[in-house]
Structure formats: structure tokens, C-alpha cells
């Protein structure tokens, strides 16, 4: 089996004991299986939940707190306990671990996003095992990643992982709720996530987690769009992750391999960037961008909305108001208003800078 880059997401329900604390047995089982992946030469990233589950009992909560401040306080206590437990277990296998705590803002700000990309790449090159969690204790929004399901999809895309394994307490996707319907049919393989498949998932997670099957399907759809194939399921024993790679996993495989890899910069534009303005283009420019993969030139711009600066992200719309994509603009809004509709030679004749496209195709994403 060739060397692959594997992202594994382990949810709270797969880590916690019956009282809500961290189960040493379950954690040890996961670590042993992750160590086997490393032993076989694969690069491994772990996206783990469990900080709230690990910390709430230490603060005297009888069960998982439901308020934001309660969750964040429990996460502040539990994250160190969770990381300590992982570090001690991985040390038995001679594996160096690294902790990364991320928030939504780390993805929306390009410099931080690029830094996360560089750091993860260096850790993997140095054979360390990154352990990633949302920085729950300081997040401004209420644990928005959905038990880290979406976080795992975004991270797996960021590092161009070959596969994302989402491990949970359910062995895959079914056409009905298997707990309520004995005749429920399990999907062993899905080429893609359709609207029909997405509609089958419920919203609720377990008492120990925040993400139900819906968040996992949403994460799978995002991962596929970033070129990462997905497995959703369960398992036990040190061979469970290797079994998934061999096609013997107890769950659902999603996506045909190999997937098309999306460059880091385009991932950021498509999924994380904040739109600062809008550019309207004529029919010829729209066709050139969408059908022929060309860059957008000033001649094709018909109007400019907003007050964006150089290199900020803008939406591009047709004259009928349809959004066709977005990209990083090499002009400020003020500059572009003065140059819209002009041919390159006319811009050059005016002494304006003329060797920049409005949006280069390498910094453009079509919708």
C-alpha cells in the first residue's frame, strides 16, 4: 500500500465513558490504531473532540453543560486533560504529538490560514502527529464546527489529505434510522453526497457530542469538494484504520478516488474569505472566465460596488445579477471604477499600471 496522508476525526461519543469523562480504554484503542497507520508509513493528522466531555465533571457539572459559558469553561479545563492523555499514550509508541487549537477566524484570515498550512506541513514532514481541536474556550460563536466534523473536512482539504475518516458511534449512513427501523438499509458506498442523501440525516447528536449525522454528511460534502475521499463509520482494535484503507471498514465510503485536489489559495477563496465588494461583468467576460478559464480584464467590467482594497475578495456577477464566482481583486474599488470598460492599450496610454488582470485565474473560483 502506497504512503498516504490520512486525517482521522474522533468525536466525543467515541471517546467518553458512560459518566461523560474520557474513557482511557477507548482513547488507548484509538491511539494504538493511529500508531499502526504511522507504522505502515502513512502521514496522520488527528482531529479530536472531547474537551468539553473531559472537563465538565471536574467543574462540578452533573452532565454536559448547555450554556456557552459552561461549555467554554469545561473546554478550558478539559483540553489540557485531553491533550495530556493523548500525549502519554502516543509516547508509548515513540510518536511526537503537536497541539493546534483553531477557530473560524483562523480560516477567514488568509495570513493565519497560510500559517496553519505551513505549520501542519512542517509537522508532517518531521513525522509528528498533529492533534487538532477547535479552540472552544475562546470561540466567539457557539462551538460552530459541529463536533469538529466541519473542522475535520476543512483541515483535510487544507493539507490535501487522501482520505478523511470520521469515526463515530454509528457504523455508517442508512436510508432510515436503524435504531427505529429494523429494515433500515446501510449505504456501503456513495459516489457523492446528493440532496436526497443529505435529507436522510437528523440534526441531533448524542448527549456527549454536538454533531449528529447531518453535520457529518455536510462535512463529507465539503471534503469531497476539496478533493478528499471520506469514510464515516466505527470500529475497534488496532487494525481498524488500516481496515478502512483496505476497503474493509465498518461504515460508508463516500467519493470515487482519486479526487481532484484544490489548491490551498483557492480553498481559502471559496470557503473562508470574506467578500468586500462586487464587480459586474459583461456577457463576453463571463463566458471567458467560466467556459475558457481566462482572467478577468478591466475591459469586461461594467460596474463596481463596495469599497474594497487591493487583494481583497469580491463577488463577480453578470448583468442579470447572477453570481458566477469570486476572487482576489488586484485593484482597489476606486482604481477599478476609473478603469472599468477600458482596453489594456488605453490604460497603458494613460500611464496607468496595465500589466495586472482585475482577477487572475489562479485567484478565482467559479460557482
From Swiss-Prot:
Catalytic activity: L-glutamate + ATP = L-glutamyl 5-phosphate + ADP
Record's subcellular location: Cytoplasm
SUPFAM superfamilies (UniProt xref): Carbamate kinase-like, PUA domain-like
Any one cellular-component term (Gene Ontology): cytosol
Keywords: Amino-acid biosynthesis, ATP-binding, Cytoplasm, Kinase, Nucleotide-binding, Proline biosynthesis, Transferase
Domain named PUA: residues: 276-350
Enzyme class per UniProt: transferase
PROSITE patterns, sorted: GLUTAMATE_5_KINASE (PS00902), PUA (PS50890)
Protein residues bound to substrate: 49, 136, 148
UniProt-annotated binding residues for ATP: 9, 168-169, 210-216
InterPro entries, per the entry: AceGlu_kinase-like_sf, Asp/Glu/Uridylate_kinase, G5K_ProB, Glu/AcGlu_kinase, Glu_5kinase, Glu_5kinase/COase_Synthase, Glutamate_5-kinase_CS, PUA
PANTHER family reported for this sequence: GLUTAMATE 5-KINASE, ISOPENTENYL PHOSPHATE KINASE
Protein name: Glutamate 5-kinase
Organism whose genome encodes this protein: Bacillus mycoides (strain KBAB4) (Bacillus weihenstephanensis)
Gene: proB
